[in-house]
Amino acid sequence: MTKKLPSELKQTRKSIQTACEFCHTKHIQCDVGRPCQNCLKRNIGKFCRDKKRKSRKRIEKHGTQPYLNLGKRLVIHDVPSKTVSPSSVHLQRDFLSSDQEKPGKTPAHNTNIQYTYNINDNFQSAGSIPRITNFNTNNGQTVLENTSNNISASQAVHLMNDPIIPTVRKSTLNLKSHFLEQHKAMQQPLATNCLVATSNVPVHSGMDDSNKSDDDVDDETNIHFDSMWCNDEYMKLKDIVDISTPFLPNNSQIFSLQESEYPNPSASTRGNSSLHLTNLLNSTKSVNDQKDSSIGHSTSTFNTYDEVVSRPFISLDMLHLNRGANANTQPSHNAKLESECDSSSHSDADLEKHDTDFISPSKFRELVKTPQDLYDNKCLIKLHNYKLAYTKLLTTLRKKFLEGAEIDKSASVKDEHSTQKHNLRYDLEVIIRSILERYAPIFISLTSNMIEEDLLLQEVTLQRALLDLENMAKLVSCTPMCIWRRSGEICFVSNEFYSLTGFNKNLLLDRTSFIFEYLDHKSVSNYFQIFNELLAFGYNDINKRKKLLMLNACSSTSSKITEGFSFTTDGKAIFTKCNLLLSNGLYLKCACCWTVKRDSFNIPILVMGQFLPIFEMD
């Protein structure tokens, strides 16, 4: 049996309300004195002080306050007419008895009714309330109900917003479709009896039946989260995965624009005017400008959140320096494209004049010869102006395909000459269409988050990889090699390539020259289709991609993709054939290998081409 303690010892061991910090830490008995006996024994009496406890969060009791008349008010947070998530949403409703509505009286009890409904269910009207699953009171009772349609809609209904549950809005996963859907929603009339107080967007449950039938297909795949960061990440991931649905015009849209501008197909495709392709290429831009202007007037009534969700694009100051010059030179070049053959050369001269930061590859290599020189002279590395590069590329392609068709009059038969011009125009359309449909959507998705420092790092990575490739070409006797950027600008040419083609080194590296200038029309068309579809960003299923590329190949004889090309397992190289231009004006048939070099963002920065001549025996 435990010995009973004396009363003095019991009083000493009696627990106190607040212990000191030392006794609280050591879990020993403290006394009311300060300093306490434990601290005095250990000579730490000057540090003895009460332990501060965290204040408890006490639940405030509801006082007797008169209930305010809530009136006929329906508050709903992001509740669409049709939703796609299988989650559940909980509604909480406060019912007031008849005696509680009078001011000055305390309510007997509070009643909470919890509604649970499947988001896949469709609302028939704005006043419809989902099925009641349980009935909770303060006494702990639970009553199951079957329906709540007989409850008056005039009572206050509060939606408990769950930030995890996605809600549906009139938006799609890409920028242009998102704005077009918003513009379409603004044009649709909304019933006045369906206007409710919302936090973000109007509820579509009160639309006409015709409007609901039109939106059934759109709402099935349009998911919008309450968090703008989560929604932005979802859109970018969806764009990267779903690369088969670009937001730019597809084949049918381009040909529909062509038919709308040229009702007569023969007059549009076989006419003598070369402005047909220029108008066709600019038609998409004009239509988009008209839509953007109309959308800009209507989107002012939308919430400011819509502006935050808009897809970011890379916009640097150096890219805007050439805006005025390009705006002045472009219309004059398009107007004189057919009559003056020297208009493209004037345009190139104007672009070179305004490109003050341009350093030719030969001059840059004189300054930077080793990797250490690259980092010592890092100030010399500037952001490459790809906007200006693609402008020059478009001018080069127009000159090669359109003006080449006008100058080449060696055909003996007029019909044969007309067919040749038609095929060259069609080849240029195929090239531009492959860029818009295959390359541009994925490129925009990958670069939407890049900043100016990322672009500078990309240029440093390009120059560092270029040094390694040049050293490889100089150390060993390799096949004729040429290295160019993703825009086609030549960066390096090996000595074997000079010996094979007969061109001068200064002609290729002292100015902005493109690899497409030294390939024939068929090789250029094949390169763009293979690069945009397979080589630029890689591929998963080789056979599937190859079959898709064959099916998408045009029926033109000059632009039909050759069947003799193969791939590497890592998806970074393609083996095919091409016709290489020589200094005497003739073309040499070569077997070539195109190898791509990508950066950490999986964006192509360099393409290395190796050419091996094929000599046919008679």
UniProtKB/Swiss-Prot annotation:
Q: Where is this region: Disordered?
A: 325-353
Subcellular location, record wording: Nucleus
Q: Which family does it belong to?
A: Belongs to the ERT1/acuK family.
Q: Which organism is it from?
A: Saccharomyces cerevisiae (strain JAY291) (Baker's yeast)
- Does the record bear Nucleus in its keywords? yes
* Annotated Pfam families: PAS_13, Zn_clus
Q: Which InterPro entries does the annotation name?
A: ERT1_acuK_gluconeogen_tf, PAS_13, Zn2-C6_fun-type_DNA-bd_sf, Zn2Cys6_DnaBD
Query: What does the UniProt record say this protein does?
Result: Transcription factor which regulates nonfermentable carbon utilization. Binds specifically to 5'-CGGN(8)CGG-3' and 5'-CGGN(9)CGG-3' sequences in the promoter region.
Q: Under which name does UniProt file this protein?
A: Glucose starvation modulator protein 1
Biased composition (Basic and acidic residues) is annotated at 335-353
Q: Which residues bind DNA?
A: 20-48
